[in-house]
Amino acid sequence: MTSHTLNELIAEGVRGRYILVRSDLNVPLDGSTVTDDGRIKASLPVLAKLTDAGARVLVTAHLGRPKGAPEDKYSLRPAVDRLAELAGFKVTLAADTVGDSAREAAASLQDGEALVLENVRFDARETSKDDAERGAFADELVALTGANGAYVDDAFGAVHRKHASVYDVASRLPSYQGDLVHTEVEVLRKLTADTQRPYVVVLGGSKVSDKLAVIDNLIGKADTILVGGGMLFTFLAAAGHKVAASLLEQDQIGVVQDYLKRAADAGTEFVIPTDVVVAEKFAADAAHETVAADAIEASSFGANGIGLDIGPDSAAAFADRIKGARTVFWNGPMGVFEFEAFSAGTRAIAQALTETEAFTVVGGGDSAAAVRTLGFADDQFGHISTGGGASLEYLEGKELPGLSILDR
């Protein structure tokens, strides 16, 4: 089946109707300051379309991982303040999610205005494994919309969660796919069906264990998988090399060895760095040097050395692979990009993506934060996903509850 779209909803007429929108406002904060407003900006078009059409918009969202109760540090206030600065319509924040404040604020909402309900994860029922508990919370959210409400899912970063505001609400209201979710799905389909080749995947980040399922599904589909980040050291260990004090998942070495064998049989090439930047300690000002990837313990720091970035030769080789591709998907930084001394590998990958003629997708999460932190603009890439975990699970071939419920 095909999901109904936002344009279909607007064509039906939304003036004066309460439209419940699940947005993605899960942004990084430094105290009360939003440090990356990419997801807020991405949520604006749908909210603007609805308010322009006269809808009374109720926004649900989460921030962080509160433990089922209100915590000031996880309030949506900073995100909503930024949203209000960017929006061309009135935006307010309710003091709670489904309590008296939310009900009163919703009742006083006017056509063309938006009300953001406080963090849905302040209510333990949002993420409950119990269907009845989640359903009860969803019923309270739906009650805010009155007799002629509708639901729009525009939070791609949450579609892999079977949560009340994502899944259960959609089963209780006429439901529609937001433009952001629609775009994300269309982009990711290009990575899984009729993909333009050569198809190069760049995988980084800390742990192999976080990427096992996506690696498994990419074998035989991707032409080349470039490996960086902390996970590269488990690949080096699988090839029989010592990695000193670098991050190593000992229990995944056998799994990686199996992947390498299967990939060779399936025609997928794994490319592992030939040089790495090794540091004396994990710190921004740590002494460091570049060494061959198969001789990490030969660095000045011996067995205490910690690999914190791919080396310049590897970065150049990876860039060449990217520039020769037709499709590129990147998920995970190549090193500790937050430290300037260990950001060169990640910067090189980002730069290569901006220079290739390939269709490029930056897979959300740390990768999206990295390109922005390093000074790249979103429009320099084909697409920057708003969903890190959701993007990976889509590429793993998993059914995503928040999408499947829209297709019912």
Swiss-Prot record:
Pathway: Carbohydrate degradation; glycolysis; pyruvate from D-glyceraldehyde 3-phosphate: step 2/5. ATP binds at residues 211, 307, 338, 364-367. It catalyses: (2R)-3-phosphoglycerate + ATP = (2R)-3-phospho-glyceroyl phosphate + ADP. It holds the Pfam family PGK. Keywords: ATP-binding, Cytoplasm, Glycolysis, Kinase, Nucleotide-binding, Transferase. It is found in: Cytoplasm. GO terms for cellular component: cytosol. Its main location: cytoplasm. It is an enzyme of class 2 (transferase). GO terms for biological process: gluconeogenesis; glycolytic process. InterPro entries: Phosphoglycerate_kinase, Phosphoglycerate_kinase_N, Phosphoglycerate_kinase_sf. Its EC number is 2.7.2.3. GO terms for molecular function: ADP binding; ATP binding; phosphoglycerate kinase activity. Substrate binds at residues 24-26, 39, 62-65, 121, 161. PANTHER family: PHOSPHOGLYCERATE KINASE, PHOSPHOGLYCERATE KINASE 1, CHLOROPLASTIC-RELATED. Belongs to the phosphoglycerate kinase family. HAMAP family: Phosphoglyc_kinase (MF_00145). Monomer. This is Phosphoglycerate kinase. It comes from Pseudarthrobacter chlorophenolicus (strain ATCC 700700 / DSM 12829 / CIP 107037 / JCM 12360 / KCTC 9906 / NCIMB 13794 / A6) (Arthrobacter chlorophenolicus). The gene is pgk.
